[in-house]
Amino acid sequence: MKVEEKEKVHSPLIDMKKKVRELNALAKRSKKNFDNSNYRKNDIRKNIFIYMASELQFLMLGIMLSEELTSYECFWPKWKNSPLQEEAMIKHQGDFLNSLYNGFYFLFFVQVENYLRLIANSNHINKEEEKSIMKIFRNLAKEYNLSKEDKNLFSIFSELRNLSHNGGFYSKENNKSIEFKGYKFIFEKGNSTKLPFSLIEYNVFIAEHIIDLIEKINQKTEKIDYIEDNYAKIEFTNE
């Protein structure tokens, strides 16, 4: 995912310890939602929260481990004849964090996408077996009367995920600007996507509001008794 940020990922202006605390709070919130859910075992509306908690913990632990990349006692000297120079280690820390942020974003999206598809299929909203997750979400938004802000949130979420798939922003429109919570996200063909803040701040921001959205959809689907998580059908055997 190529984006423009106000600060570099390892900028001293970003309080990373604060971001770790925020991620931990979101992971705990998701775990609490899972524990307190009234939905049955293996219902995707229950399981989605444990999946999101897992991805949030993965990101949080990755950030904590990244501190070792600029430590003279890090793993590099243990596996190399000589340690890398400090300047190189700082660059590697930035590369590591960029990869971590992108990896989290992609995996987080996969969990949410699977959740939305199962919701749509269970309620016959996806009668035409639509493949596009954006079109599926629009149908869900219409069915459950989701707000324009909800639609904008998922549009931003989806467009940034597509950058990884498509290698850039592609649309019939030359430019696309989406507003959410007072922030503007600018997508332009041939240019880096402009975020209103750094990748780690964006990850925390998007995760918080996606959790809000899923809580809302879960409430609106309470009349559906059971929506089976497709992971519950997977079996592994050893030969």
Predicted segments, located by residue:
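Alpha-helix C-terminal capping segments
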Residues: 119-123, 144, 209
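Alpha-helical structural motif
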Residues: 5, 129, 133-136, 156, ...
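Charged/polar positions within long, soluble alpha-helices
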Residues: 116-124, 162-173, 215
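Short, charged amphipathic alpha-helical segments flanked by flexible coils
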Residues: 125-143, 173-190
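Short, mixed-charge amphipathic alpha-helical segments
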Residues: 136-178
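Extended intrinsically disordered or low-complexity regions, especially N/C-terminal cytosolic tails and loops
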Residues: 1-100, 148-152, 159, 175-239
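Short, contiguous, well-structured surface segments enriched in hydrophobic/aromatic residues
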Residues: 76-80, 102-135
